[in-house]
Amino acid sequence: MEIFTLALALLLPWMGGYLLLAGVEGRCGLRAGTLRQLGLGFFLGYAALYGIVALYDAATNSLAFWPILSLAALCCIPGALLFLKRDTPGWVMSAGGGADSSPLLRVLFWLCAAWTLLHLLLVAIEILWRPTFPWDAWTSWLYRAKAWFYAGALIPLDEPAAWLEGAPTALYNAPGASYPGFTSVLALWSALALGQWNDSLVNFPVLLAGIAMVMAFYGQGREADLPPWLAMLGSYLLVSTPLLSTHLSLGGMADIWIMGFVGFGLVEIIAGSVRGERYKIVLGACLVIFALAVKNEGVVWLAAAALLCGVMRWPRIAGAAVLAGCVVIGIAALSGIHSVELPGLGQIGVVGDRLHVPLLGEMGLARLELWDDYLANFMQGDSWHLLWPLLALALLALAFSRPSAPRRALVALLCVLLATQLAIFQFTEHGQWAEEWTAINRVPLHVLPALLFALILVAHRLCARARPGEAESGKMHWSLAPLAGLAVTIAGLLLYLDGSQPGVDREPLNLHGGDLRLIAGSGEQHGDGVRVTDFQNGIAVLSSGALVLDSSRLSVLELRLRSERESQRRMRFFWRTTSDPQRVSAIEFPSRDYVRSKLGESVGWHGTVIELGLILFGEAGETVDVDSLILAPSSLGGSLRTLWHDWTFHESWGQTSTNFLFVGASDAAVHLPLIVAVWLAVSVLFVWMLRRRLASPVALVIALGVAGWLLLDVRWTTSRLQQASDTVAFYGQGDRAYLDVPTGEKYLLQRVQTSKGLMRDPGDTVLVLSENGDSDFLIWRALYHYLPTPGFAHTG
């Protein structure tokens, strides 16, 4: 019964949104497709659901599932009547596309379709098994939803600062308490349908959002007269983008919803501008406006959408308006006018060192150098696959092509994105969110659908304008350019790795785990290694004992160990030298089964080493097997082995996964996306050099870009399959409310449940703090577990 009511609660608003959109477009005789209407109808229906829940609470000061569901059903009636009376039926295939004629393109279509379904299946596994995972979700968005569920109303919450100052006005407090409630209400709605708070199923709307996005993107592509293979390729590129896939899988974040409204709103604006369909521009503007109900940053995207619309529809007027605005600001600054009061909106301008923006509040001015952070995330990290290199190639190709609507769309969209990034990060104190990589990827994620849609429009335009035919005499095989690019890339990689080797010839120092002596904690021999079975105050220390070692000759550490999934939070390698025997130097590593580190780059690794060892962290009942500790001279072969291991290493979900991603080891010497991007760039250069001797150079460049993306996605999908297996294995063992991250939350949850039983009044407020002041994660998790008991998290 619970699953039935959940399905009814989630599908009814979706169908209501679809019926309304399809009915309006059908009654107006507009050319529209069923898949696009289903996809966009989902977001329209859920926007209406949010309004219904908020209005019901405002009228009754309570929440009741069946009355709200009945109101939602009544709101579906006008859309259903319009749908039944529409003049034109919906359709799926566009008149201009038809089926793909080439067998190769049909294979590509079904490959992308199958891979898209696989990505959605992996998302479903995470949603169904994993409890709410991201930090922002359970400290803010879903903390508020959970509090509302137990309170039975959309009660106000305080910011933690109000409680810290001793002036609370609400029963609960949470960071971002003043943010719009859309994300929280959707999780609350799922809980109301279930009749209980289920930390996994409350995120089920996020899975439906992913399905709706795929439908909307494919449908919009077909309406734009893209061939089926290209529309499906775009849908696959969307759902296979690692950062989007991660947000879908982990749930609880507002970024998915603001991407649904802003991203597809901009898609509608672009599609309407390119094809001259004004109703799509209006619909796109409405979607962007709905983003105001998700996050305050929707104001920025609304301004960006207005600018994009102006550039697309009236480029000269928009350019003149921007220029006039700059002139007015310049004159005001020269005249000493730095801020003005806008009636009903508040102050806009600069007062002292603070920037005031209507609806967004005030923020400090600052100037940060963020280009290295953008390079690390957009070119080296795994959050985007090859999105940014492909966009750069598209811009380069458009520079040599004739003006067109797709070209104007891509250039305008990237300029708008650049302007928003500069406005948010480059010149204000919010730049620290980019510098710390907290939001540097999440903000561009909001416009990902529009970026990909503009990209495939450009690809289609370039293919249509290309003139395939017989090349000049001496035609070359298409494989020459990518093979030459591969050879150059490999040669460059080998030269880079070889240049970092000192060339010292020395036998390595090979210590088995059994050669290390436990001086804190206890364990037992396990083959040639040692198994740590007990941790003393949470740590175990293994020492080599006294030795004499020339650090300059053995500068590479290789460590192999095995541990349980919940074990080994982190580890440290330590050493002492003759120059300062009392000082212990150490470097810390994340949890993994194999570590290779260049000690020569570490502070303190110099002179003669007289002792070395390991510090392992764990808890009661956990074990760690230390197999070997090797100190070796640096070599090209060793670097290549380490690089391969780093590229194929599986990095489990972490609390930063919704901010940035590294599919392999985050400390790899060279990251695979950068290598693939270099190969793509060099291959494209060879294609350009040989363009007169190749039959279809444009098609070849597009094929190379797709091949590079598929290569990276093979690794990403493999990692996702491993992650799904780990998730099912961990959370399938009973009702586990604690997260599979190495923090000791399992024992925290037991203490929370015990203390709840000792409380005289469940309505009492709890104060959660830590003795050592460095356990912010556990403090906030305790606050979440204490619900419905109100509490305050004292951190620091």
Protein language model regions, located:
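Membrane-lumen/periplasm interface segments of specific transmembrane helices
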Residues: 123, 130, 303-304, 311-401, ...
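Transmembrane-helix signature of polytopic, membrane-embedded enzymes
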Residues: 32-40, 197, 217-240
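Membrane-interface helix-loop-helix junctions at transmembrane boundaries of multi-pass membrane enzymes
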Residues: 99-104, 222-230, 275-279, 314-321, ...
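Hydrophobic, aromatic-rich transmembrane alpha-helices
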Residues: 210-221, 310, 384-411, 415, ...
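Transmembrane-helix motifs of polytopic, lipid-linked glycan transferases
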Residues: 75-84, 201-224
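Membrane-embedded, hydrophobic transmembrane alpha-helices
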Residues: 1-105, 448, 455-460, 488-503, ...
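Membrane-interface alpha helices of multi-pass inner-membrane proteins
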Residues: 234, 268-269, 280-296, 302-307
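Membrane-proximal, lumen/periplasm-facing interface regions of secretory-pathway glyco-
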Residues: 131-136, 710-753
